[in-house]
Each structure stands twice: as structure tokens, then as C-alpha cells.
Amino acid sequence: MDWIVHQLRVHPELAIFLTLFVGFWIGKIKIGKFSLGVVTSVLLVGVLVGQLDITVDGPIKSVFFLLFLFAIGYKVGPQFFRGLKKDGLPQMGFAAIMCVFCLIIPWILAKIMGYNVGEAAGLLAGSQTISAVIGVAGDTINELNISPETKEAYNNIIPVSYAVTYIFGTAGSAWVLGSLGPRLLGGLDKVKAACKELEAKMGNNEADQPGFMAAARPVTFRAYKIANEWFGDGKRVSDLESYFQENDKRLFVERVRQAGVIVKEVSPTFVLKKGDEVVLSGRREYVIGEEDWIGPEVLDPQLLDFPAEVLPVMVTRKTVAGEKVSTIRALKFMHGVSIRRIKRAGIDIPVLAQTVVDAGDMVELVGTKHEVDAAAKQLGYADRPTNQTDMIFVGLGILIGGLIGALSIHMGGVPISLSTSGGALIGGLFFGWLRSKHPTFGRIPEPALWILDNVGLNMFIAVVGIAAGPSFVQGFKEVGLSLFIVGALATSIPLIAGILMAKYIFKFHPALVLGCTAGARTTTAALGAIQEAVESETPALGYTVTYAVGNTLLIIWGVVIVLLM
């Protein structure tokens, strides 16, 4: 054991990976629906490892923190700038005011309780579950004209206050928005009914949905032998597909075997005759039912031997950006292609007829390879799997953002700046937006983005925990149980105020009120709780714009809270 401790002291990088290993493991454990979460677990494990008196030198903490902030900005950049358009301004304005609540309430409570700068910053970070504030506030504290000892004391108390308030910040937010929120809107049944009403309005019904599919309802391809008298002396492919459409089934003829010859690319004017074998594609429940009408299903490996493709496509074409899904699916190039999924700022949004597709959205298409490829060219940029990250783009973005953040102005002799961390966030926002406009460069594959986001943040948190370890216990004794109660108030008051503001001032649809509030607070866990409570995915429609704004402003509040104190 002594040998292991010695090695961790000599090689502190191993202590960091020990912290990550144990922290991620504990963070995945759930007791019922409760989990500490990875970030809190990594912090607490880092504190325990820090009791071994391990010193982590060098800029490793800052390097990973900048990577994390750039990744955050990169993800939400397209949606952040889209919110500046007229139709996004109400949600953007709501999110900005909500974020002010999230700053002012912790600040007022910190003043009332007599907290110092570090305690106030930790209260903000934990109660609003915005871990990046730890680093941003720390950078700002280091620029203050105070003694090095005071700076160290403030920086060491931030993770203590964060850990005490984060648990209710996460679990409490889910409870306020998922349980209390519907009551504030007139009751759970009323909100459920409002969600169903919005779904119906947006096209979530059997008659309007045959062109769409959920992940649980995959596109399938089946072969049938034509036997129905309806075909008579022959029917064109377009006649058959129109017949399906009239019966609320969006099915397509993909291949035909006629007189023993396989026709691989079938034109709309191709004539189908009794005895032909046809391959139909579409939602599984519709395709399977055609055995009773067309004729018997046949097992023809040769006829069914063709590539089908699932392809994510970034929407960039002006001709489709801003259009409803129902409009896009009616376009000629969407023949044979279904939309399985839409992701916006990394969040899945409902695929409904009236859902508007924005530039920068990632739309997942399903169909035969040649039809999907043709549709992808008309929608935007095919985001094909790759293991290459454009590190020129990443490095340049962080460099430019960091240099901008390093610029400072002096007010009353106090230097004020975004800091390099705030600058990296701004750089990520701009470069993420730029990538959505010009997707031929700046590619960061989703797994790589996950690494930058999750490993970047948790590597930073691990070092913070290890550094704070020796003083953590004493700091916890000083803040005590009272900080937990103050944190609960700092979490709950802005959320309740946000719900009431969204309902009475902004007059959002009840289905969107809770999603907008969750987005402004960037609490994805609460969004899941809301959707589970109201039994609908529609709250996600209010989440993405407010999430982009909240993720930006709440991080910048790490600078502001220090200056206010």
C-alpha cells in the first residue's frame, strides 16, 4: 500500500486516472432513480485521493477545461445563433431572464449568509448544476488584487460548496420541474392533455405519420408476389404508391422481379403485373400488413440482396432549412426515404409533421443507399462515420477564443475579462455555427466530441478535487448543513419563478413551459423527468434554444459572481 501511495505522489498523472476510473464507476451506480452523477463522483473521489497529499503541477487542468468549454460551445453554436432570428427571440429572451434569476438568487442568498467569494461561486455552480463555473470563477479569482493565500483559500472552498449544493441541484431540479411544475400549470392531467393537443396539432396521428418512424419502429423491406385482381392487366408503380398514400400508408416499391429478371431501380411509370415479385419499404407495421392484400410474402434472398443505409445528414440547404417535416417529406427527392431521428444541439426532438427543421440540425435518414444518398445531397452534408477530428479547427478555435477572452478592461483598478476559459466558450460558439454553415471542414465526430466534453470536464474536476483534498474536510465543517438548505433555495426559487414567468408573461404553450425552463437551466436530467411525467416528447421542442443560451450565460456568470461579491 505504501508503495502505491508513493507511486501516486511521484506520478500524479496516475492519481488523476485513478480518480477518473473510480469516479466514473461510482457515477454510473443508481439507487432507484437516484445517482450522484459522474461529475460529483469524480470530485468526491478526487477529494479522497487528495488526502494522500498529492500535488498536480502544470497546465493540465486548464488544457482539459478549455477543451471542454470549446466542445460545449461547438455543440450549441448553431442553435444559439438561430435563436437570434425572429421566431427564436421569445425563447431566447426568456432564457436570458431566467439565467439572470439563476445568478441573482444565489448572489442575494450568499450576501445574506455572509459567504466569501469562493463559497458564493461554489453555491452558484452547485445549485445551478453548471460545473464549468468552478473553473471560470477560479480563473477570475486568480486575477483579483488579493494575496496568494486568499486566492488559494477561495479556490479550495469552491469545490466544497459545489459538492454540498450539487446533489439537490440535480435531484431537486428534476423534482421541481417533473412533479411540482405540472401542479403550477394546473395539474398533471391538464399538462398531459396540452401535450397531446400539441402532438395532434403538429401531426402525431396515424393518418399524418406514415412517413415518419421512431427508433422502435424501423424501416423494413419485404418481398411479395402480386396476386390481387386490383392489378388487372397492369398498374404503374406510381399508381400503387398513390393507392398506399390514399390509405395512409407511405410505402415504396424498391425492386421488382418480372419474368425472372430483377429490376434494381424502378421508375414511377414501370408497369406491375400479376405474378411479379415486388419489394416494399416503409414502416414495419405497414409493410407486414400487405401480405393480405398484394399477395403472399416470398423469401427471395437474391431480390432482397441490396444495401440499405442509415445516414445522419447535417441540414445546410437554404431550400429546406426552416421547412416543416411534412413539407420536406413531400419533396420528390425524399421518395423511398424515411426520417428516423432529428438531433438539435445534441438533443433529440420529436419527429412530427409540423416540426420545423433548422440549419445545423442532424437528420437521420433511412432507406436504400442510392435513395438516401440522393436525398442527402438535397438536404445538406452527409455526416458519414469517420475517426478523424479536424484538430486545425479545434486548435485555432481555442486559440482565437482564448486570446479574445484574455483581453481585459480596468474598472476602478480591477481588471475585468472573460478569461481564457470564457473565450474558449465563445470560440466554440462561433466555430460551431461556422461548421453548420460550411460543413466541409471543422468535423468533430460524435465520439470525439463526447471525449472533449466529458473527459475534458472530468479531468479538470479530478485535478480540482485532488488539489482541494487536504482542506476539504475543514471547509465542509465550516459551511455545514446550512449551505445545503441555502443551495436548495437557490435551486428552487429560480425554477419556480421561471415556470410562472413562462406561463403568465411569455404565455408559452403548457407543453413547452417546462422544457424551456429546463433548457435555460441546462438540466438534461430534468428534461427526462418532465417527459416521463407528461408522457410526451414535446417539452424537448422548448429545450434547445434555451439550452444554448443557458449554457453560455450560466458559464459566464462564473466571472460575474466573483465581481459582484
Curated annotation (Swiss-Prot):
The upper taxonomy is: Bacteria, Pseudomonadati, Bacteroidota, Bacteroidia, Bacteroidales
One GO MF annotation is:
monoatomic cation transmembrane transporter activity
List the transmembrane segments: 14-34, 36-56, 92-112, 117-137, 157-177, 391-411, 414-434, 448-468, 481-501, 508-530, 545-565
Q: Which residues form the RCK C-terminal domain?
A: 296-381
**Homology family:** Belongs to the AAE transporter (TC 2.A.81) family.
Q: What is this protein called?
A: Uncharacterized transporter BF1518
Mind listing the GO biological process terms from this record? potassium ion transport
Give its localization.
Cell membrane
